From Swiss-Prot:
Residues 1-91 are annotated as: Domain I, interacts with DnaA modulators. Residues 137-354 are annotated as: Domain III, AAA+ region. It comes from Alcanivorax borkumensis (strain ATCC 700651 / DSM 11573 / NCIMB 13689 / SK2). InterPro entries: AAA+_ATPase, Chromosome_initiator_DnaA, Chromosome_initiator_DnaA-like, Chromosome_initiator_DnaA_CS, DnaA_C, DnaA_dom, DnaA_N_dom, DnaA_N_sf. GO terms for molecular function: ATP binding; ATP hydrolysis activity; DNA replication origin binding; lipid binding. Keywords: ATP-binding, Cytoplasm, DNA replication, DNA-binding, Lipid-binding, Nucleotide-binding. This is Chromosomal replication initiator protein DnaA. It is found in: Cytoplasm.
Length: 474
């Protein structure tokens, strides 16, 4: 009876919660009821999930169960564990063979020797002729410890950690990370692969760019080694494929990947994918692939917010053994907003300027080193542009944003536009207020605080804000 109660509870929670929250935190929970139905134990895959669910969702779970139960409510427990006889992670990556013809090969190749980080993480061409040696192609510099977490990427990082600790677990296979360039998708993908190999050096983990998969398939067809191609890609413990948008329009490659995808999932092998946008928005991808990509967890990665950009700069400066003052880090972060790659590029220019001139890092030096980038950013994002984009997004007129109207349909977009102006431009609060119909700085400050509060409590406002941020910085 308690298990039936839990299924009804799941249905309610799925309706209430945003899909990414439900799929990430609630769906992976497994339930076990005591013989007398007096106790209901929820099993989470690791301690991180236990702590998160207890902090964010357990009270609501208890409320829903109470609303649905006519009699005494079973005692609710939350623990790390599984209802299955063995933990999935113990069998997915132990190098064992499978009875299926599409399953893992009987002898996995040894993990490659550690390599130093490379400037280009894409693998070099490999031959499919003869016995193919397993090479992970992982960048050993991309780990969880070198990844800077912030609000914009915290959910994606947590999902990646989950996969690294519990590969091929329910609700996380495949794991798909999507977003614009330079936001850390590839870093997280490599971090999972490196952690899987750290936990089990015999795991067969393979990273490659989607174009490499296509090139290997073409080579296999030309050399009549397509069966070996299939055996190799279907024998891995974890397959990590970057930039799947490049499969678009390549029908034969999509056909082969479709069958590889199915074989891996059927045999409990982990798949991790990245894409530059939500796959359903990619023209030229077959609908059946788009559907399968949604079987697991799809997690967006957004441009980093100011605090995360500062943290990234400080960490990279520390790695380069350069002292970056806080005011200098904030100055750079306020002006380079689009992605991590551009942020790191700006810091490299500053460091090069320091080493060439022998000067100390200060605001003046940064202005000189980044003068063309700063000028470009200033031209790209203006308050006028923000007002235009926000008005189009909310389907109102720009004059409405400048008017004294206080109806919610106008006031809320105006507050969002003010908050974006503060985050994306170097204008002061009084200057922003002046551009919004002559309002004073206290109105702008209130708008910024209100939007921050709403983003934390209202998923719809958070989605609107991030959509606008992505549009303005892309």
């Amino acid at each position: 009876m308690s298990e039936e109660l839990w299924q009804r509870c799941l249905t309610r929670l799925e309706d209430e919660l945003p899909s990414q929250q439900f799929n990430m935190w609630i769906r992976p929970l497994q339930v076990a009821a005591s013989a007398d139905g007096a106790e209901l134990t929820l099993f989470a895959p690791n301690r991180f999930v236990v702590d998160w669910v207890r902090d964010k969702y357990l009270d609501r779970i208890s409320e829903v169960l109470g609303e649905m139960q006519s009699g005494p409510l079973p005692q609710l427990r939350l623990e790390v564990g599984s209802t299955r006889a063995s933990t999935p992670a113990a069998s997915y990556f132990n190098g064992s063979s499978s009875s299926s013809s599409n399953g893992p090969i009987t002898t996995p190749a040894a993990a490659p020797a550690p390599r130093q980080p490379e400037s280009d993480s894409r693998p070099q061409p490999t031959s499919l002729g003869g016995a193919r040696k397993h090479r992970s192609n992982l960048n050993t510099g991309f780990t969880f410890s070198t990844f800077v977490e912030g609000k914009s990427n915290r959910m994606a990082a947590a999902a990646a950690q989950q996969v690294a600790e519990n590969p091929a677990s329910h609700g996380y296979n495949p794991l798909l990370l999507y977003g614009g360039v330079g936001l850390g998708k590839t870093h997280l993908m490599h971090a999972v692969g490196n952690e899987l190999l750290r936990r089990n050096p015999n795991a067969k983990v393979v990273y490659l760019h989607s174009e490499r998969f296509v090139a290997d398939m073409i080579s296999a067809l030309r050399n009549k080694t397509i069966n070996e191609f299939k055996r190799f890609y279907r024998s891995v413990d974890a397959l990590l494929i970057d930039d799947i948008q490049f499969f678009a329009g390549k029908e034969q490659s999509q056909e082969e990947f479709f069958h590889t995808f199915n074989a891996l999932l059927e045999n409990g092998q982990q798949i991790i994918l990245t894409c530059d946008k939500f796959p359903k928005e990619v023209d030229g991808l077959e609908e059946r692939l788009k559907s399968r990509f949604g079987w697991g967890l799809s997690q967006p990665m957004e441009p980093p917010e100011l605090e995360t950009r500062v943290a990234i700069l400080k960490k990279k400066a520390e790695e380069a053994k350069v002292d970056l003052p806080n005011d200098a880090a904030f100055f750079i972060a306020q002006r380079i907003r689009s992605n991590v790659r551009e942020l790191e590029g700006a810091l490299r220019r500053v460091i090069a300027h320091v080493r060439f001139t022998g000067a100390q890092i200060d605001i003046g030096l940064i202005k000189e080193a980044l003068k063309d980038l700063i000028a470009l950013q200033a031209r790209q994002i203006s308050i006028d542009n923000i007002q235009r984009i926000v008005a189009e997004y909310y389907k109102i007129k720009i004059n409405d944003l400048l008017s004294p109207r206080r109806t919610r349909s106008v006031a809320r977009p105006r507050q969002v536009a003010m908050a974006l102006s503060k985050e994306l431009t170097s204008h002061s609060l009084p200057e922003i207020g002046e551009n919004f119909g002559g309002r004073d700085h206290t109105t702008v400050l209130h708008a910024c605080r209100k939007v921050l509060e709403l983003r934390e409590s209202n998923p719809e406002i958070e989605e609107d804000y991030l959509n606008l941020l992505r549009t303005l910085t892309s």
